[in-house]
């Protein structure tokens, strides 16, 4: 197996499903399986030099031990292995006109550096102005600032925020929590929210429906993302309520 030099003689493969594909990671051993709250995970771009680390997880709350684990940027790994399969093909974008008010921006929450870069290029190709954030918490704080500005000016929040585009798994605040906070706030609930995640499958889509997101696209396909954003913004402009918009509904 390329790049692997096992020292234990054990051939253990950790099978994952990510970004519409199945992968096998060679590991020497499995020490423990833990469930963590995303509040225990912190962004690490400025603290860790490795390009394959996206965040650091605190495995316990004991200050004397304070065990830490580095979280892999799987999207970066997949992009390096098969870049053609995990790129946003902006050159092949089907051009369209998006219903965005002048001055409004897209708020993007994405912890993976490579995914964030691809989203930035994709939104530029769509001519959608965007502000990018590493965590859901950062995005939520920016939404609060823009909401305060909208209130002070006496204008709808959609004059400031055209849509929110968020990943699901992020440090400090995940995409489910971010979406739920937006959709349960009377002042923010009209902001269209599109989930753009490497996690796929019916279970995740059910969770996305429960938090009342407006759209869902599995990474990475720019035309699908563009189509979902177009439909979500069109429905928002016409003030039409409807079911979750995903590539299944648009197919």
Which residues does each PLM region occupy?
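Flexible, small-/acidic-enriched active-site or ligand-binding loops
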Residues: 29-63
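Acidic catalytic/metal-coordinating carboxylates
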Residues: 135-138, 174-177
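Active-site beta3 strand of CheY-like receiver
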Residues: 147-165
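Receiver (REC) domain active-site loop signature in two-component systems and cognate sites
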Residues: 170
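Conserved acidic segment of CheY-like receiver
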Residues: 103-114, 119-123, 164
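Alpha4 helix (beta4-alpha4-beta5 surface) of REC/receiver domains from two-component response regulators
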Residues: 177, 199-219, 223
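Short amphipathic alpha-helix used as the core "switch/output" element in two-component signaling
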Residues: 176-189
């Amino acid at each position: 197996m390329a790049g692997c030099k096992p020292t234990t003689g054990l051939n253990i493969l950790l099978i994952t499903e990510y970004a519409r594909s199945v992968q096998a990671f060679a590991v020497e051993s499995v020490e423990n399986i833990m469930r963590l709250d995303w509040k225990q995970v912190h962004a690490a771009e400025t603290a860790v030099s490795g390009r394959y680390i996206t965040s650091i997880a605190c495995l316990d709350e004991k200050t004397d031990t304070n065990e830490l684990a580095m979280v892999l940027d799987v999207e970066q790994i997949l992009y390096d292995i098969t870049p053609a399969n995990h790129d946003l093909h902006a050159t092949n974008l089907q051009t369209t006109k998006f219903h965005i008010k002048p001055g409004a921006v897209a708020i993007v929450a994405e912890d993976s550096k490579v995914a964030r870069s691809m989203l930035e290029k994709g939104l530029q190709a769509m001519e959608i102005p965007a502000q990018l954030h590493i965590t859901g918490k950062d995005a939520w704080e920016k939404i609060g600032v823009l909401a305060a500005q909208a209130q002070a000016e006496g204008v709808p929040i959609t004059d400031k925020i055209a849509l929110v585009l968020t990943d699901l798994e992020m440090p400090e605040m995940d995409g489910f929590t971010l979406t739920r906070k937006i959709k349960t706030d009377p002042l923010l609930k009209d902001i269209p929210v599109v989930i753009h995640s490497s996690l796929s499958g019916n279970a995740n889509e059910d969770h996305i429906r429960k938090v009342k997101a407006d759209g869902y696209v599995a990474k990475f396909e720019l035309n699908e993302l563009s189509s979902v954003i177009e439909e979500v913004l069109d429905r928002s402009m016409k003030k039409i309520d409807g079911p979750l918009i995903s590539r299944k509904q648009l197919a």
